[in-house]
Amino acid sequence: QNANIYVDDTPAINVFELRAKCRRLAKQGIDLIVIDYLQLMSGSTEKGGNREQEISQISRALKGLAKELDVPVIALSQLSRAVETRGGVKRPQLSDLRESGAIEQDADMVIFLYRPEYYGITENEDGSDARGTAEVIIAKNRHGAIQTVRLRFLDKFAKFTNKDAKVLPPEAEQETRTFSSRINDDDDILGGLSPKTDDAPF
């Protein structure tokens, strides 16, 4: 209950509402903003644009928000169905980002999670066993190297560990508690004011 974690589950929140709430929270000090996930957000209320243009607007707005508040913004994104229909290797690529190339352009880093076993692949290209493994693919890194890191994936716990890490039985693991405070349950977080929907996203 003392953790500084704020959860906002407003359905189809738009970029203007999000920015207004983040600005309020910034006065109390925030270190990270996580969007889960980008395609669930809505853009401006203007009509006439398609979904790809709307996602592009959201992506640019999140980039502007990160710069304005000087905090990292992690935005989860869906992948295109083309990954599943593609023959051969199913490893995700930048072109698989759904509905917008703007995500690739705006992001400083793009990281994919890939589990070969999910697609029925049991052997990696180098001949190593792919079962129970996952890859963290750094597909874009504006400030560093592009590389892939292999991890162990424990499907029973939906947990990632280092490949050579010793796995403890569940009863031996330290109890973990999750704390959160909900933005929408705190009437004072926006000072009783509604965000201005006519404000520019960035």
Feature-to-residue mapping (PLM):
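Conserved inter-motif catalytic segment of the P-loop NTP-binding fold
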Residues: 1-50, 57, 64, 85
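Conserved H-loop
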Residues: 76-78
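C-terminal regions of RecA-like/P-loop NTPase motor modules
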Residues: 15-30, 60-69, 82-202
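A generic secondary-structure micro-motif detector
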Residues: 51-52, 90
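Charged, low-complexity surface patches
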Residues: 54-55, 93
